Amino acid sequence: MRINPTTSGPGVSTLDEKTLGRIAQIIGPVLDVAFPPGKMPNIYNALVVKGRDTVGQQINVTCEVQQLLGNNRVRAVAMSATDGLTRGMEVIDTGAPLSVPVGGATLGRIFNVLGEPVDNLGPVDTRTKSPIHRSAPAFIQLDTKLSIFETGIKVVDLLAPYRRGGKIGLFGGAGVGKTVLIMELINNIAKAHGGVSVFGGVGERTREGNDLYMEMKESGVINEQNLAESKVALVYGQMNEPPGARMRVGLTALTMAEYFRDVNEQDVLLFIDNIFRFVQAGSEVSALLGRMPSAVGYQPTLSTEMGSLQERITSTKEGSITSIQAVYVPADDLTDPAPATTFAHLDATTVLSRGLAAKGIYPAVDPLDSTSTMLQPRIVGEEHYETAQRVKQTSQRYKELQDIIAILGLDELSEEDRLTVARARKIERFLSQPFFVAEVFTGSPGKYVGLAETIRGFKLILSGELDSLPEQAFYLVGNIDEATAKAINLEVESKSKK
């Protein structure tokens, strides 16, 4: 077992015995601190600034050492606002990296980057803590079995299946439905797999964090009456936090997930919304630390920072962490260094398309751009692979024909192409699905569709058995039987109108 959580007991020294330094310089969220000769803190040590500001308000700021500058000075990044700090203030070296509470006590609670509860539900049992910086598991501890992680979402399970213990990227610009998809996945996984989730809200909107919390309480993922029965722990470092907090909140969430995997030997889901904000926070801090910017103004250490986070997210012989990461794509440009670096670590990508969202097809997952290393006949089986390939071919042909249709109209197409277009439009609509978490907006009850049902449905559309049904019947339904029932209802309605 890799993890060695520290158990704080009577033997742990108090802050009073620690080395004291003084603030020498403050540049926004970055502090330079002078220490006595020979008493320098280590890289990643947590420093605490306590005192009162000019108005007499209590100050308690935790920082993390990033650089040793020479001349007995260190440069540290603050994890909370530096308002009210002045030069000459006392700084305490805690002698250890940031450590956060782990284990069952974290379920149903909301934490900040320091592992402090921020949900006004009282203190958390902090007897078991783990440092947020740790090396990735050794090769010999990794589990190499390949298996599919069923999500109950048709377009995902069929065309870009997720790997159990893999890393999945949700790509998309602003407002195409990433967060709703993440909420649906948390909901489905808690209900269908009974798994524990850790949600890391990295640099996103506070309102969304609050909505997600309320949604989880309503759906029973968080059990207010008995928090121990909750299925998720939440860690937030939102947009209003300084870059230091946004840069480290992902590691706090990951540390909590690692404990469930290594000590409790569970399968864990780690959601990160949004991994781009992790990179962005690193880039904000990087220039203040005096590093030369790299491509497009990003930090030169971009690949290293990303690697140190991603390599810890993996399956071991004890358990697995399956990670689903929302990736904001700046200006919808997939070649931007932030999404491009993220791509290198992923087993599957779910790309959300603005075009599909504009058509009202939700989830707006692009069937041609989304990929998965799991979509191979030896892993998913011949039937699944064949069906997925035929769905992609039909969608691709429809895409190629769209220019001709726009200029000349459908009548100019050959009989075969017209049939392809009709089936592709049915497929496009059948890839949409009502979500449990969107019931409030849509009014239609959510649907969980098993993989076997999904394959059966698409095989029927491709075989031509359902060519006579109107394409509207396939829109926002669960399995194929619902589509045929909807077609009958539509027919009855149209007759009654006449």
From Swiss-Prot:
Keyword Transcription regulation on entry: no
Reaction catalysis annotation: ATP + H2O + 4 H(+)(in) = ADP + phosphate + 5 H(+)(out)
GO cellular component term, pick one: mitochondrion
MF annotations from Gene Ontology: ATP binding; ATP hydrolysis activity; proton-transporting ATP synthase activity, rotational mechanism
Keyword Manganese on entry: no
Top EC class, one word: translocase
CDD domains: ATP-synt_F1_beta_C, ATP-synt_F1_beta_N, F1-ATPase_beta_CD
Major site of localization recorded for this protein: plastid
Name the UniProt record assigns to this protein: ATP synthase subunit beta, chloroplastic
Gene transcribed to yield this protein: atpB
